[in-house]
Amino acid sequence: MGIIKTKGIILSESNMNDFDKMLTMLTPNGKIGCAAKGARKPKSLLMAGTQLFVFGEYMLYQGTSSYHINSCDTIELFYPIRTDLDKLKYAAHVTKVINDVTDENQNTYRILQLFLNTLYMISETDKDLDFILSVFKLRLLCLLGFTPQIKACTNCKTGENITHFSIRDNGFKCEACSKIDKGAIRISDSTKTAMQYIVLADPKKIFSFQISEENLQELNLVSNLYFNEKLEKEYKVENLF
């Protein structure tokens, strides 16, 4: 079997035998299972690069049922996540979501890019963790094919007097049309602008905006409800201990 060189990030790790690990890694070309022989030995050259959240470059060879890691070079450890329980909790939540929505043999370059940018924001900045999570969820939905209508009312197509977001109809509603959609959520102009920015911004700049605490509550509500509805699962940030 040939050697494969790829960049990837560790989504999960489990112990195997006395010193080995079984890993799930997200690469630009999908999710793969990897065995890391001897990675738990104290002096193993694989130890640093086979931990949860680590982004690295890996040399792999394909076995009968999984890939095996020959060598690895770490690119980013996201160390602050490991020393802050709140950061760890949110990073674990984001990682679970990514694990759920990705599969083998698919183009996951843009999802990997979003995942790395999100972990960087959690790890290296002091931005509100709920803000980071809301931006991540809304942008991820766009990558999964659930881009909301954020230019005009989903019903009458007007761009004027947008006052609500409709989970049912996947986008904005004007004041008049919102009256026939009891589930539509009222949003401010600032929240509307924030959502438009998240959907349309350059991938490297999606977190580069300010929002008030009141409007962040609206953004959190909309992104969480919309996310859970489209993925047909209720995601919550869980306590780790």
What is the predicted role of each segment?
Residues M1-F241:
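Non-catalytic alpha-helical scaffolds and adjoining flexible linkers that form interface surfaces
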